Amino acid sequence: MPGVVRLLALLLVPLLLGSARGLHNATQRTFQIDYRRNRFLKDGQPFRYISGSIHYFRVPRFYWKDRLLKMKMAGLNAIQTYVAWNFHELQPGRYNFSGDHDVEHFIQLAHELGLLVILRPGPYICAEWDMGGLPAWLLEKKSIVLRSSDPDYLAAVDKWLGVLLPKMRPLLYKNGGPIITVQVENEYGSYLSCDYDYLRFLQKRFHDHLGEDVLLFTTDGVNERLLQCGALQGLYATVDFSPGTNLTAAFMLQRKFEPTGPLVNSEFYTGWLDHWGQRHSTVSSKAVAFTLHDMLALGANVNMYMFIGGTNFAYWNGANIPYQPQPTSYDYDAPLSEAGDLTEKYFALRDIIQKFAKVPEGPIPPSTPKFAYGKVALNKLKTVEDALNILCPSGPIKSVYPLTFIDVKQYFGFVLYRTMLPEDCSDPTPLSSPLSGVHDRAYVSVNGVAQGILERESVITLNITGKAGATLDLLVENMGRVNYGSSINDFKGLVSNLTLGSKILTNWEIFPLDMEDAVRSHLGTWGGRDRGYHNKARAHSPPTYALPTFYVGNFTIPSGIADLPQDTFIQFPGWTKGQVWINGFNLGRYWPVRGPQMTLFVPQHILVTSTPNTIVVLELEHAPCQDGGPELCTVEFVDKPVFRTVQTHRHAN
């Protein structure tokens, strides 16, 4: 406590030095900074926010109100959200603001519940989200310098902000909405460039669209170099840090860049992110609560990142360098679990908050009920190779050398690369990616015989066998673009040449695969079992690997039972790695042999009681029924999430 008192004394010094700014105009709603007394003013009255992060793009719209109400009942008076550009503009000029993408409705819903909103519209957001929220199609300009004053980048950003920010303007606090502050960029000091022209460009565009009086801010880590590049005059500089940080040092660093004004931790970490193959990250409730208490005792404004993490459905997860993709779950060990459940951490933080602010009275919405629907048998349907006419109805693109995903306008998912072996490989011959050009994972086969896997940065050579003229296929998976640091220009596919022995492989056929359309529209026309020359050859595949294959099954939820359907979790006993859809909804990636995530969250709104629910699994390596009957090939619905880490090896799985 003496340290807190000493820091408080240091921080009060500017009261004698500052000049009064941000005076209240009683005729309108205002949210301003009182630089004289180091605080925010809301409608002229002192105000301190206690906020939590929630990402609308990681929580189904069906559950927005439930999660927001739980946040309010914890004592929060504000929520913070990013806006993920690529979530709204998946293809250039084609915008989606409906359904789960309706950010305006999300913000309005927070307003209706009495929550203020701290908006972080990027354009870059990090967030462990694919490419940090930047759309992959920006990479069609191969030399583009992202997050800079590169003219190509600024032109795209300018157009996007011209679409997004006018939608946000009516939702600003001054206009009757809940948005009190708006962040410019995101932790820009951590990026390779220190481009003040870029920040000034954003500052001007935000003012153009939102007004000169909007309160703009930046966020950077507690490091002087980071703040030097991330802060800009006219943008209020805030910091972010984790439990256990020295508060005196952290806030004095903010004071170096903002001598007066409120103390703000824009990202106080309640947990941490996961990577495939690593232990599930946890942070003790005691540590989070202790530091939160001390920050609130100082009068600081705090946003807890995350208050609920949510889910990276489909292909939306990001990755870090050295290449480490994040899993489907973004649980984050947050106060509300991935499924929105109340945790011990939730109540620990609520107890701290109520010492400093009024916590709403009344019942807290309970954790949603979960149901274990049990095991569901799946039948083998088709391999990816056998379904090419459905997955790529327009046929392949031909090129002497490999093309990237961006070259063929495939932004997510999978591309199959095909060529012919130029010579006999009777003895095992190295298929190599000398420049680690497989981004990110290639499932290799010769004439329908699975050979093994090439993996970015870890497995760059694989011995294969086959006759001259045999078909060499590589199904390449985009496992998520890098979302942080200097490597966010993350091209996918075969980004450099492959060699067989000493020869460069040429004359490729490239199949961009539309998995979503095939799963949603053509499932019933796929026919029965595999057929053709592949069948005989598959018997000789290495036992660890098989061709990437689709499996399908159905299960029925009784319609006469009250409160069904309910949320559930799906697990994959005996399966290896792949993608799963339920009723056409892409739940995301499973990889139980790597962990730590063993189950995938299944929200109730994608389930039905009127007809059977259809499960489609794309197993990329080896299914439990690969060598046995379909009765061995099951998935299981359970009522609790499971996280654990399995020992991994660089050469397998």
From Swiss-Prot:
GO cellular component: lysosome; vacuole
Glycosylation sites: N25, N96, N246, N463, N497, N554
One Pfam short name: Glyco_hydro_35
Keyword vocabulary terms for this entry: Disulfide bond, Glycoprotein, Glycosidase, Hydrolase, Lysosome, Signal, Zymogen
Propeptide stretches in the record: 23-27
Biological process terms in GO annotation: galactose catabolic process
Disulfide bond entries: C194-C229, C625-C633
Substrates-to-products reaction catalysed: Hydrolysis of terminal non-reducing beta-D-galactose residues in beta-D-galactosides
Entry annotation: catalytic residues: E187, E267
Residues involved in substrate binding: Y82, E128, N186, Y332
Gene3D superfamilies documented for this protein: Galactose-binding domain-like, Glycosidases
Main location: other
Signal peptide stretch: 1-22
Assembly, per entry: Homodimer. May form higher multimers.
Name of protein: Beta-galactosidase
Organism whose genome encodes this protein: Bos taurus
Phylogenetic classification of the source organism: Eukaryota, Metazoa, Chordata, Craniata, Vertebrata
Gene: GLB1
